[in-house]
Amino acid sequence: METNKLYECTVIIDGGLQDEPIAEAMAMVQKVITEKGGSIKSVLDIGRRKTAYPINKKTIGYYAHIEFTADTPVIAEIERVLRYEDVLLRYLIIHLTTPLLEMRKRVEKYSVVIGSPEDKAAAEAEASEEEKK
């Protein structure tokens, strides 16, 4: 019996598009996930960013992360549909395992905006105390 697993889908949409086609592309990705039997947990729109290298001669992409749960066979169906969408420059679906989730919690815990040297020293002291445990 398959149980739903937690996945993360990162998509890069053509950043040269206007806001409306980008919103439609995001809605399409979410619709594909839910139609194929997935359940969306969260959506994080990162926004337009410069890509590390040109993708299909485009250097600006609109980045988004979608966390969802689904059965393992559903992932192949989702990828099959996303593969043929022209507005998506890239997509990647990964299974979020326990070590990845623990690492994410640690990164979120220590990723504070450090404004003053005192804040930086306090964050470093807290990190060293955690490492000693």
Swiss-Prot record:
Pfam entry (one): Ribosomal_S6
GO BP term (any one): translation
CDD domains for the chain: bS6
GO cellular component: cytoplasm; ribonucleoprotein complex; ribosome
Example GO molecular function: small ribosomal subunit rRNA binding
SUPFAM superfamilies the UniProt entry points to: Ribosomal protein S6
Record InterPro entries: Ribosomal_bS6, Ribosomal_bS6_sf, Ribosomal_S6_plastid/chlpt, Transl_elong_EF1B/ribsomal_bS6
Domain of life, per lineage: Bacteria
Keywords, sorted A to Z: Ribonucleoprotein, Ribosomal protein, RNA-binding, rRNA-binding
Job description of the protein: Binds together with bS18 to 16S ribosomal RNA.
Similarity comment: Belongs to the bacterial ribosomal protein bS6 family.
Cross-referenced PANTHER family: MITOCHONDRIAL 28S RIBOSOMAL PROTEIN S6 (PTHR21011), SMALL RIBOSOMAL SUBUNIT PROTEIN BS6M (PTHR21011:SF1)
Name assigned to this protein: Small ribosomal subunit protein bS6
Organism whose genome encodes this protein: Chlorobium phaeovibrioides (strain DSM 265 / 1930)
Gene for this chain: rpsF
